[in-house]
């Protein structure tokens, strides 16, 4: 997302965090974060299906108040009050592209489910389970295809995920895996799960670097690599290491949108391009 959209996402996220926070002196909150997650995902799906609605709710020529009023008219009867407030906050912002609004609502639906994990003290557990399950899908193309197949009913995918994860992973992990499989916008379940893991890491105040390497790394090498990457980016970085033999050697490091490619595969490709000039 570009500048305006990033600001819109941050503003809507602040509304989500404020609405789902446990009040001082209270042990619980009455806000159903799971319902909020379902609502936000439903609105994102609506915007994906209805480009006219998406354009109307992001129209920079319309005053913010007009866009929030339109959201209330269209969605007020279907959404929880907290969900509607988050959507109205989002549509009152400017967006670099109309599609960024639906992407932001999808991300916020993930964060709402992660609030459930936070309340359960299981955010780190969910983050790790999401990352590991994404890697499992990467190593099992047939399983990934079964979960991505647009012709397969959601009930079939949910049942498959239930057999794989129920009793083995936190309930929020299962919900997020089901959400990734149901995502009509992005489609790639493995990538979405990795994205969800990074969102969980961000909620824990951590920045994650995904490191792809051709060979397994020892703990000592991982520690040295982590220190070097932290120095490079000027902040503390947590590594998630992924084996990828196709790289042939070296490593590829991805932090957010920035990629540092030190793989043998990249160097061979560069040499090949030089020979063809």
From Swiss-Prot:
Annotated localization: Cell membrane
Keyword tags: ATP synthesis, Cell membrane, CF(1), Hydrogen ion transport, Ion transport, Membrane, Transport
Cited InterPro entries: ATP_synth_OSCP/delta_N_sf, ATPase_OSCP/d_CS, ATPase_OSCP/dsu
Coiled coil: none
Topology in membrane: Peripheral membrane protein
Record GO terms (molecular function): proton-transporting ATP synthase activity, rotational mechanism
Record has Flavoprotein as a keyword: no
Family in the record: Belongs to the ATPase delta chain family.
Summary of subunit composition and partner proteins: F-type ATPases have 2 components, F(1) - the catalytic core - and F(0) - the membrane proton channel. F(1) has five subunits: alpha(3), beta(3), gamma(1), delta(1), epsilon(1). F(0) has three main subunits: a(1), b(2) and c(10-14). The alpha and beta chains form an alternating ring which encloses part of the gamma chain. F(1) is attached to F(0) by a central stalk formed by the gamma and epsilon chains, while a peripheral stalk is formed by the delta and b chains.
HAMAP family associated with the record: ATP_synth_delta_bact
Function: F(1)F(0) ATP synthase produces ATP from ADP in the presence of a proton or sodium gradient. F-type ATPases consist of two structural domains, F(1) containing the extramembraneous catalytic core and F(0) containing the membrane proton channel, linked together by a central stalk and a peripheral stalk. During catalysis, ATP synthesis in the catalytic domain of F(1) is coupled via a rotary mechanism of the central stalk subunits to proton translocation. This protein is part of the stalk that links CF(0) to CF(1). It either transmits conformational changes from CF(0) to CF(1) or is implicated in proton conduction.
Protein name (record): ATP synthase subunit delta
Gene source species: Frankia alni (strain DSM 45986 / CECT 9034 / ACN14a)
